Curated annotation (Swiss-Prot):
Keywords for the protein's UniProt record, in alphabetical order: Cytoplasm, Nucleus, Phosphoprotein
Modification note: Phosphorylation by MAPK3/1 (ERK1/2) regulates MCRIP1 binding to CTBP(s).
Main location as per UniProt: nucleus
Protein name (database record): Mapk-regulated corepressor-interacting protein 1
Superkingdom of this protein's organism: Eukaryota
Record text on subunit structure and interactions: Interacts (unphosphorylated form, via the PXDLS motif) with CTBP1, competitively inhibiting CTBP-ZEB1 interaction. Interacts with CTBP2. Interacts with MCRIP2. Interacts with DDX6.
Organism taxonomic ancestry: Eukaryota, Metazoa, Chordata, Craniata, Vertebrata
């Protein structure tokens, strides 16, 4: 049995202007956490923008798909998880205790 290669989108671009999510009174985030979230959000928005440009034919080579030549055998049974669902379950468990 052969396993299919793992593919990832690699972003090769610049960071955009700052974006702030609305505050949630039940959660307190450190400035470092907010900066990390902002960086990831901005980088992903850039990937999506560049991918749309590339797909419309106006730009080429901005977004590349990375495919591992030899997949890591320890990731063979890896199953992605929905982080929102995990957070929701953890919050519900905390409220029960």
């Amino acid at each position: 049995m052969t396993s299919s290669p793992v593919s990832r989108v690699v972003y090769n671009g610049k960071r955009n202007s700052s974006h702030r999510s609305p505050p949630n009174s039940s959660e307190i985030f450190t400035p470092a956490h907010e900066e990390n979230v902002r960086f990831i959000y901005e980088a992903w928005q850039g990937v999506e923008r560049d991918l749309r440009s590339q797909m419309s034919g106006s730009e080429r080579g901005l977004v590349e798909e990375y495919v591992e030549k030899v997949p890591n055998p320890s990731l063979k049974t890896f199953r992605p998880i929905d982080l929102s669902d995990l957070k929701r379950r953890n919050t519900q468990d905390a409220k029960k205790s």
